[in-house]
Amino acid sequence: MPQAKKSTETLAPAPPGRSRSLLRSLPSPALCCACGLCVLLAGLNVTLVGAFAAFLPGHNVPLVVGPALLVLALGFFAACCVCSRRGPVPRARSSATAGQGGGRPGTVALEMESSERTAQDTTAVQLSPAASAASSGRSSPGPGLFALDPPAPATAAPYLPRTEGTQLNFPRDPAAS
């Protein structure tokens, strides 16, 4: 297995106003976004309840609490933006993984496996009513309830798809004709 190329890039230093410990302690952007959505929905619900409960805003508590929840939701979304702009968290590699071909952290090697193509992969069945204009003249029912056209003769390459499709012949409804 070929070794992955080692990166010689170094992590950028922390911005002057922030330390690395502050960046590590921030919550994930997904958590901030999920909390923001929950608070946003709660704020909208409380605001709508207050808006339709009474028309006097002085004695209507939901009209005060609802917008406060909406401002809190905006704070969560702002935190989501701040958390999503943080750089990658540096991870210390242990000596055990470094010596065993662990590769760079964060990279994944994908390996796809495919099977042989068979006639089953490319077989198509055409379903059409027997009395339609698109059907062939061979639409008379066979010995069974549903009859298939006879199979094509075997060729030298049995796994090549046939050029003509298999046609199902359904019995005709006597009431329709």
UniProtKB/Swiss-Prot annotation:
Signal peptide: none annotated. The keyword Transmembrane applies. It is found in: Membrane. It comes from the Eukaryota. It is a multi-pass membrane protein. One of its GO terms (cellular component) is membrane. Residues 128-161 have a biased composition (Low complexity). Residues 1-20, 113-177 are annotated as: Disordered. The chain crosses the membrane at residues 36-56, 63-83. Keywords: Membrane, Transmembrane, Transmembrane helix. The keyword Transferase does not apply. This is Transmembrane protein 275. It comes from Mus musculus. The lineage of its organism: Eukaryota, Metazoa, Chordata, Craniata, Vertebrata. The gene is Tmem275.
